[in-house]
Design a protein with these regions (language model features):
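Conserved catalytic/ligand-binding micro-motifs in nucleotide and anionic cofactor chemistry
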Residues: 2-478
Length: 478
């Protein structure tokens, strides 16, 4: 046995003994446990129906991830919950907050964008919206990407011709703008449409966003007939074009086969890595798709990755009524109960059958997941090569996982700003970028003192590591 193997074996025994010593006090209740390393950094968070029985399993024969993890455990914490579903929710919240090394992590976890119908103005408008407050106004979505929102907004603008300008721009207009000239706005700002007629357009938008496309088409057909009988063929033609556009949207919706709001989740594996493709359908309309590449350890299987993804995804995102999966999870009823507690929604989780009208959609999702994963692995290989070159160039002892690059800028000492760019195994990580407004210039740091500015930026950055140890850099370039 080598010295390294002996030390690892001793650490495993030490970790097991620590857990064994705590077992007597651990209750036989549901809850969440946290394993911490020598620096009191949380390295794993788990949930259990019975905390004592679950922790006892770590004192027996272990393999893979668990062996390595137990060798690093110096502290153990736990929290009791009133049910297993509550433990599942708490586990997801803590994983999202602390990002432990040995848990499956959802990296790209931005909130989904919506289309919002603003109702706080005399002439409402459709806008992009990203946030959690879905109370004021009427919302359509969520969408998988901002691009999908922009495409849909453009289509709705062509059909309903609601204003798209800001409130100040609207109130300052004396004559119609270009949007009116290209037939994408009804120009309420200059009275080209009456308030009554504009409100009717708004009501049509509400009907459409509620998924009642067919009833809206029927209503418009009646109006078109009425205009034709009055020999008002210009208005009848406008409504005819609107019906055609809505019919096209309806045709696209019918190809999905989904009546209820649905989230379709497909997972695929290649060379030990996973890609999860999420397709969103709301009110019968496709709202786009997005690939995710969760971080995980080598011995975590498809079901475990899928379970972790579901709970982390829906921590702050509202689920659809139906969640259709490409692969099964161990306890779908537990997840259904947890989502009910979290969002107050009755959710149905099931594996999509291999035959049927919607089976083809799952096959498309799986194929897209495979293509996205292949591209992801190619990009990862390029990034790894770049990191290896950095390691060689600067004679680093290990491959860096997080590189931070700093610089600052100012205009003759004024408007000083510092910037941090972050790169790692997945390339440049834009969500980790930071800007620092230099505060010290108010305390005699001015006149273009770059060293003083960098000192302030680095002091502020490093002071945050106490609360964010998982963001510790392996290498800094200044």
């Amino acid at each position: 046995m080598t010295q390294y193997q002996k030390k690892l074996s001793d650490n495993i025994l030490s970790g097991k003994e620590l857990i064994r010593a705590r077992l007597e006090e651990v209750p036989i209740q549901p809850g969440v446990y946290r394993m911490l390393d020598i620096d009191k950094k949380i390295i794993y968070i788990g949930k259990a129906k019975n905390l004592k029985n679950r922790l006892k399993q770590y004192t027996g024969d272990l393999e893979g991830k668990n062996l390595t993890m137990i060798s690093l455990v110096y502290y153990l914490e736990y929290s009791v919950t009133d049910s297993e579903s509550s433990a599942l929710l708490l586990e997801g919240q803590l994983i999202k907050k602390f990002k432990p090394t040995f848990n499956i992590l959802l990296k790209d976890d931005k909130s989904f964008p919506y289309i919002k119908l603003r109702l706080d103005h005399e002439f409402p408008q459709l806008i992009k919206y990203r946030g959690k407050d879905l109370k004021e106004g009427k919302f359509f979505g969520p969408f998988a990407s901002v691009k999908q929102v922009e495409v849909t907004l453009l289509e709705l603008q062509k059909i309903f011709k609601l204003r798209s300008c800001s409130d100040p721009y609207f109130s300052s207009r004396k004559r119609p703008c270009l949007q009116y000239q290209i037939n994408r706005c009804s120009a309420p700002c200059t009275g080209k449409i009456s308030k009554e007629d504009y409100d009717e357009l708004v009501n049509q938008v509400k009907t459409f966003l509620s998924g009642k496309n067919k009833s809206l088409q029927h209503l418009l057909a009646q109006k078109m007939q009425s205009f034709s009988e009055e020999l008002n063929f210009e208005e009848a033609a406008k409504i005819r074009d609107r019906i055609k556009a809505l019919s096209y949207i309806q045709l696209k919706a019918e190809t999905t086969g989904f009546v209820k709001d649905t989230d379709l989740i497909a997972i695929t594996e290649l060379n030990g890595e996973y890609c999860i493709e999420l397709y969103i359908y709301r009110a019968g309309q496709p709202c786009g798709n997005h690939p995710y590449f969760p971080e995980h350890t080598e011995d975590q299987n498809i079901s475990e990755v899928l379970e972790a993804f579901i709970m982390q995804l829906y921590q702050d995102k509202i689920p659809a009524e139906n969640i259709l999966l490409s692969h099964s999870i161990n306890n779908s009823k537990l997840f259904t109960k947890a989502l009910k507690e979290l969002h107050g929604i009755n959710v149905k989780i099931e594996v999509l059958k291999k035959s049927g009208s919607t089976a083809n959609l799952m096959q498309i999702a799986l194929e897209n997941a495979r293509i996205a994963l292949e591209q992801h692995l190619k990009n990862s290989a390029k990034n790894r090569y770049a990191l290896e070159e950095v390691q060689k160039l600067f004679n680093l002892s290990a491959l860096p996982n997080r590189i931070e690059v700093y610089d600052n800028s100012h205009i003759q000492g004024a408007f000083a700003i510092g910037a941090m760019v972050v790169a790692g195994r997945e390339g440049f990580d834009k969500k980790e970028y930071r800007l620092f407004t230099i505060k010290g210039q108010l305390q005699n740091i001015g006149g273009g003192d770059d060293y003083a500015m960098l000192r302030e930026v680095l002091t502020r950055r490093l002071s945050r590591l106490k609360n964010e140890p998982y963001r510790s850099p392996d290498f800094m370039i200044i």
